[in-house]
Regions:
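N-terminal Rossmann-like NAD(P)+-binding domain of SDR-like oxidoreductases, especially those catalyzing
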Residues: 1-125
Length: 125
């Protein structure tokens, strides 16, 4: 039996990490995407990274950026997930006031990019 395969965007955040835990309990193969700039900020998923029975067996991490459609496309094509969960966002509240265009790109335009990648893939996700 093939395992269900999911991609969780925003893997190191609170909601993304909870989703990863749930999917692993349901016997999924889970791939998590985390922003390159959040390296070292893996506290919410350290219990998985440090578990030799899970990490790189049922749970895999990928560095990426929602604003880089090429890397997103490459990751989605490489993994071929059946499900994608998007919990990613810019996590600095102050930035949303100081650089509103960045917040807009991260929360709105990135979703459009993800949907476009899925549409072009012509595979049911």
């Amino acid at each position: 039996m093939n395992k269900k395969k999911a991609l969780v965007l925003g893997a190191t955040g609170q909601d993304g990490s909870y989703m990863i835990d749930l999917l692993l309990k349901k016997k999924y193969e889970v791939h998590g995407l985390y922003r390159k700039s959040s390296v070292g900020n893996t506290g919410n998923i350290d219990h998985l990274i440090q578990n030799d029975k899970v990490y790189n067996k049922n749970f895999f991490l990928h560095k990426g950026d929602l604003l880089d459609s090429v890397s997103l496309n490459n990751i989605i094509n490489k993994i071929s997930p059946k499900e994608i969960y998007n919990f990613a966002d810019q996590d600095h509240v102050g930035w949303s006031y100081e650089i509103p265009s960045y917040s807009f790109k991260t929360t709105a335009l990135s979703v459009i990019e993800i949907l476009e990648i899925i549409r072009k893939k012509k595979q049911k996700i």
